[in-house]
Amino acid sequence: MSQLDTTTPSGDYLMALDAGTGSVRAVIFDLNGNQIAAGQAEWLHLPVPDVPGSMEFDLTTNWQLTCQCIRQALHLAKLPASAIRAVAACSMREGIVLYDRSGTPIWACANVDARASREVSELKELHNNGFELEVYQCSGQTLALSAMPRLLWLAHYRPDIYRQAGTLTMISDWLANMLSGELAVDPSNAGTTGMLDLVTRNWQPNLLEMAGLRADILSPVKETGTLLGHVTAKAAQECGLLAGTPVVMGGGDVQLGCLGLGVVHAGQTAVLGGTFWQQVVNLPQPIIDPNMNTRINPHVIPGMVQAESISFFTGLTMRWFRDAFCAEEKLLAQRLGIDTYSLLEDMAARVPAGAYGVMPIFSDVMRFKSWYHAAPSFINLSLDPEKCNKATLFRALEENAAIVSACNLAQIAEFSGVKASSVVFAGGGAKGKLWSQILADVTGVPVKVPVVKEATALGCAIAAGVGVGLYEALDKTGERLVRWEREYIPNTEHKALYQAAKTNWQAVYTDQLGLVDCGLTTSLWKAPGL
């Protein structure tokens, strides 16, 4: 339980359903933002046989797991279902669900489903190779992970499903539909389909028409924090919530995470450190990157958009390093009763800033239009075991994650004019005290770490509360409920060192991309259609 406040004015509670890439959670909060209990279940998104790149979302099993989590959360909280005043859902973005004309879900895919690589290439050729730019100028998205190539794939290979489709939503909206029977999308999540206008925050049907796709499958758009419907008797029997409980529009996981962190005003900046790292900047008005390096998403705050860059597999890289090379440290940490990452950070803290020049090659900065990475490697190693060892490599990985984040924030500042004056650092990465200090040193601005680091569910609960009048507004509530654990001030002595390290890394990374281009090495990840 995260302790923000020990007093609750009433016995009212809110539930957030958080459908992530690797798991689903049902989280109960009191009205002061304290997490009371959570039920969690891992889920898998398996490939379809003989469909390369596919990542199917199992609608039947995943609803059963969601119901299991809801019941588990209520049990752990020792609360009756009547104590839940409202529920809202959030999810990974990009994942879509199709329904037939009676409203029954018939097909879904998860966020990084890459089956439509050929269709991405096909769509890029439209309008003398200008269609992707048109999509980006309208929606802030490129085609790689958008919905249109996936719909075109269905038209090509599963015309039975394509013909049956009556409505399209996101995965968060599917959860809300399973609870309430109502169908709608919110701008923050639906914006990642590449079919929503950043300015109007509504669908742009002509984009589908230009792609030769049906434009009659677009569901109503409702803003985050508005009432959608109520838990049906059928859903109540399945999940354990009380029939009639209000169901409120949720949204995309990153945007609701920013709400839970109080990142609700223009100019505010967050770095969300999970499996992927997102660098998010609130923009004063909808603008796009003329170089198409950065995605632009609708925020859950009406009228606001966010520039978002993504570092690939940052958290996954740290886990790989821990599991592949640090068996001794894992055993020692277990004996000491501490987290292995904490032990590795203690070791890395004794390594000088700059990690003796070791350069990790993993994620590139974000280049949304042509998005791929070099082959994973370490460059500039030494044979001196005093200088090149596990502690050095671990520090180098933490420094590199901060360097990539700083490069992404610089790209955003270049086209938007918005330069971060401070950074909110959240997610699992923010648990690292050394990592937080390194991020401050590399970016050159103060880094604030919140008490609640996994803030997506809290933001979702805030939306639920606003929808039933328990909170006044999204932005004011997000600001009021966030609590700060600590702040890190940049060490100016490290500024020149990290600037040089960043310049050197950028040059070396460019050379490493050349090896991928020549077919000599294998990219860490490559977007569909490249």
Swiss-Prot record:
Pfam families: FGGY_C, FGGY_N. It is an enzyme of class 2 (transferase). One of its GO terms (cellular component) is cytoplasm. Its EC number is 2.7.1.189. It catalyses: (S)-4,5-dihydroxypentane-2,3-dione + ATP = (2S)-2-hydroxy-3,4-dioxopentyl phosphate + ADP + H(+). InterPro entries: AI-2_kinase (IPR033676), ATPase_NBD (IPR043129), Carb_kinase_FGGY (IPR000577), FGGY_C (IPR018485), FGGY_Carb_Kinase (IPR050406), FGGY_N (IPR018484). It is found in: Cytoplasm. One of its GO terms (molecular function) is autoinducer-2 kinase activity. Keywords: Cytoplasm, Kinase, Transferase. GO terms for biological process: carbohydrate metabolic process; quorum sensing. HAMAP family: LsrK. Catalyzes the phosphorylation of autoinducer-2 (AI-2) to phospho-AI-2, which subsequently inactivates the transcriptional regulator LsrR and leads to the transcription of the lsr operon. Phosphorylates the ring-open form of (S)-4,5-dihydroxypentane-2,3-dione (DPD), which is the precursor to all AI-2 signaling molecules, at the C5 position. Belongs to the FGGY kinase family. This is Autoinducer-2 kinase. It comes from Yersinia pestis (strain Pestoides F). The lineage of its organism: Bacteria, Pseudomonadati, Pseudomonadota, Gammaproteobacteria, Enterobacterales.
